[in-house]
Curated annotation (Swiss-Prot):
Top-level taxon of origin: Eukaryota
Lineage: Eukaryota, Fungi, Dikarya, Ascomycota, Saccharomycotina
Main function: Component of the biogenesis of lysosome-related organelles complex-1 (BLOC-1) involved in endosomal cargo sorting.
Descriptive protein name: Biogenesis of lysosome-related organelles complex 1 subunit VAB2
Subunit structure: Component of the biogenesis of lysosome-related organelles complex-1 (BLOC-1) composed of at least BLI1, BLS1, CNL1, KXD1, SNN1 and VAB2.
One cellular component (GO) term of this entry: vacuole
Length: 290
């Protein structure tokens, strides 16, 4: 059997590897304080890096917040503008719908106006026919000088509206102005002679007619209410008859008939003015009775 040489521990390779290892630290060096103290520089660097990272992160977060605020403001402004445009659109839509309804309403009004114009034309034609019939009837059925369309003061006071309507819309005769001026006064201030001949039937009849004429003029100047007309009619006649003194009535009545002749051409073509239907009765001045 081969004999191998004896190898000592010091010469062994394992021992050499063991010697190559670092020595174990002492127990005092294994405490927390010693450990942190040994790595204090690295620890400070880590703390600095963490702080720097934290600051950068906070900075980025703040920037993001600012950008978010700006975006939110822009969104609010855009939303407000969109809302305004939306309300304007609704308003225009309502106006458009109202315009369509207004157009229909205008068409309806147009038809109503056309119908009203047709009715007015019919009324005007009827009014022309009525006035023509009145003129024709008056010219054929009126008494001596008692025509509705002459310038007699009796007719003018009894029928002021009709008188003004006819004389404003129909041509007058050539002598109408002169006749109107002559008819402005009627002389009744005459005295009856105190004789027995005045009691004849003809003179009494003429005196009664002239008294009735004076009563009609006085009644037109001072209208009496309907409820008091019956009670005051007889008393007014008695007062007027007692106040009128006639010197010669046979001269008065022919003069009245002569001045009461019609002064309007009855065959004149009517020209009706729409704004002159209403007569101003205040402008009709009563004639002076001298």
């Amino acid at each position: 059997m081969d004999n191998k040489p004896l190898i000592t521990v010091a010469e062994a390779s394992e021992y050499k590897e063991l010697l190559a290892l670092e020595k174990l630290p002492q127990s005092s060096q294994l405490s927390y304080k010693a450990i942190f103290k040994s790595v204090s520089s690295e620890w400070e660097q880590v703390k600095t890096d963490i702080t720097h990272v934290n600051e950068n992160i906070l900075k980025d977060i703040n920037e993001e917040i600012e950008q978010t605020d700006q975006i939110e403001k822009k969104l609010k402004s855009s939303f407000k503008s969109i809302n305004q445009h939306y309300h304007k659109l609704l308003k225009h839509r309502r106006n458009r719908q109202n315009d369509e309804g207004t157009s229909d309403l205008f068409l309806k009004y147009k038809n109503d106006v056309n119908e009203l114009a047709s009715n007015i034309e019919t009324i005007e034609n009827g009014l022309d026919m009525v006035i023509q019939n009145m003129i024709s009837f008056d010219s054929t059925s009126s008494l001596d000088g008692d025509s509705l369309f002459n310038s007699s003061i009796i007719t003018k006071r009894h029928y002021p509206l009709l008188y003004d309507l006819i004389h404003k819309n129909y041509n007058k005769g050539q002598n109408s102005d002169k006749t109107s001026k002559d008819n402005s006064k009627i002389t009744t201030d005459v005295t009856l002679p105190a004789s027995d001949e005045d009691n004849s039937p003809d003179i009494e009849e003429q005196q009664s007619k002239l008294s009735s004429l004076s009563f009609s003029i006085e009644k037109a100047q001072n209208p009496i209410p309907v409820d008091k007309a019956k009670n005051t009619d007889n008393s007014s006649r008695s007062i007027i008859n007692s106040n009128v003194k006639i010197k010669n009535p046979t001269l008065i009545l022919p003069m009245i008939k002569q001045r009461a002749q019609p002064s309007v051409a009855l065959d004149a073509k009517p020209v009706i003015a729409r704004d002159s239907y209403k007569a101003d009765t205040k402008s009709i001045i009563a004639p002076e009775i001298t």
